[in-house]
Amino acid sequence: MGALTYKPYNRIVNAGDINDINILANEVKKILNEDYSGSLEILVNKGGSSGGARPKVLLTIDNEEWLVKFPSSIDPSDIGQIEYQYSLSAKKCGILMPETKLFENKYFGVHRFDREGKKRIHTHSASGLLYASYRLPSLDYTELFKAAIALTGDIKEVGKLFRQMVFNVLTHNRDDHAKNFSFVLKNNTWSLSPAYDLVYSYGFNGLHTTTIAGSGNPTRENVFEAAKNVGFPLKKAKEIFDEVYEGCRGIIKLNI
């Protein structure tokens, strides 16, 4: 991922081109059902899992790089449709998103923002930058805002993060851990990456994994307090909140 590359110590035999997403999905199901007969080799050859809660593969489709997700054994059958709807809602709310689409059988796919043709875009997660655990709650959004200011020197990037935070709060995306926020380096300038992994979810004990002004179950007051903690203009914060609220109204159940 990002601009880093690596090669396995041992040579992996190429299993050939597999263009049928359904075949890959069936191999995922075999692994989840503990039938490993050949499944791991097929998935590794197609890019393997890129981490996260759901099985994923990295695919090249029409010379474009995509990440395609498959349901885990505990996901609802329409999880792909749900995440796709979230991605459309996020765009409507003014959040920078990569291109997304539903592949056959409702598998959710996202265009990789760390690739521009053959060019690799250097990408670093908040987890890596701040040495913050993504397995356990380790951050507050205030710390993310401060990191954005320190890295980019641009208060507008804080506004982008604040908008994403509001979306996460309003749409109950509580698995907002430290690896779900990244920064990209282009032309020697850092900026917040497009948003990803936006979907209805629970964090530890049902709370936000990244707290909002110290609260895992935030109120509006907590939301604006987080902005105040880093000197982000309250007027602008309220404008963003209202824009996201209106963008989600009637599409996704609001949670504040």
Please report, for each region that a protein language model flagged, where it lies by residue.
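Phosphate/dinucleotide-binding and metal-coordinating scaffold of catalytic cores
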Residues: M1-I256
